[in-house]
């Protein structure tokens, strides 16, 4: 039985096709043999710097082949990785590091000043450039022994997601959950290793987990899409065509932008065979444009919070949908059960809305260093008390249609999906209330326009939106900034004295953008 994801590489692509290209990064190609060797060299450097096992190691690198090598090197060393967003404000990075307390940090030399500025001692940093030279030696038997000491229930990585207190939560994924998900994906999605993956999502996003392990196990090629192309649909679609990309796993926002600009009619994409999407609702009228433009491709809608290891349901588009029809999130992945529970914890019937809960081996290990938050959402299955049986309460509302397909409705609370990112609106509010001159604030999400909208009270003098944006730029990534701002004399309240979020949401939906 497979215990560690590195068995995908060691017994898979590196053994079967060592000279095949594993990663393409801005014109530079790396074979599977090179990927394996550099990763082992990185592991050797990590162990020499600090001989620990089953500890978190942070990766502070932009999206590049070196980051993949660092991730694999960390796992070879018997530890687990967490990829950081180098573009995040320094305070957010500090918050993550203070929660995770990594044993070491892997970075590049050009990022050393940034690490120093946030308080990371140079003694804790291993520079990835040092692993990419021929002179590094390593003891293969020693690394193998380190891996043998690890169990499949040990952590593989930590993915940092928005937290309600202003500090991101570290979702801890295991080897077993990842292996279970990938074994399902290989079979259900008919993945055979011929794929050229157009890797667009950041490596600190959970989509990378599928891309990486498809590469390692089957010999698929990861073609890293340069970050600079993400905001330019024309350049992005040109890249997909020129690189003969055959597999993408993108958030719908990117695909909607391409559709909106009429680019699907201008570019033939005969190589594109698998189109996966997740993270937010894909408007059917835009999805239909994609299906008409690439009739030979298979389109698959996936759903799942990070806490269940990438995704837990899927829907292969196997029939026609009208432009206004809702799109199912489908059926559970293998070895996963979806429970839709009512407020009184009974199973909902067909058409009845309830909270979507997940059970199975793909559940995360919890939130790193936060047992209290973990216990709130990873709970005993409320349908019985006969044995320990954890379920994850997603906070999403869903129902089953007459076909037995699961239909997503929305969030139960203030957590949203925006541009593919999961965001706690309360984290934004937490930072808003720290801005001088703001007395109170409430953030709502206009899902129709995909706008984060801020309503706020001031302390007697105007606080311009530009001032708010500047303050938020120091603590939050850009995708979490409000895009609409409304200063109000007083926030509306409901009978129990709380801010009436529904009234504000209604106002946001009714307000003319002009």
Placement of each model-derived feature along the sequence:
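Gly/Ser/Thr-rich phosphate-binding loop
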Residues: 217-220, 245-249, 259-328, 337
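ATP-dependent adenylate-forming carboxylate-activation enzymes
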Residues: 61-65, 82-98, 109-112, 220-243, ...
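Conserved pre-ATP/AMP-binding loop-to-beta segment of ANL
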Residues: 142-160, 167, 191-197, 203
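AMP-dependent adenylate-forming
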Residues: 1, 5-6, 105-148, 178, ...
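Conserved AMP-binding
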Residues: 61-64, 85, 191, 201-205, ...
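Conserved AMP-binding/adenylation subdomain of ANL enzymes
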Residues: 169-196, 206-246
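AMP-binding/adenylate-forming domain of the ANL superfamily
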Residues: 1-158, 173, 180, 283, ...
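Hydrophobic alpha-helical segments in the ANL/AMP-binding
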Residues: 10-11, 65-85, 185-186, 206-220, ...
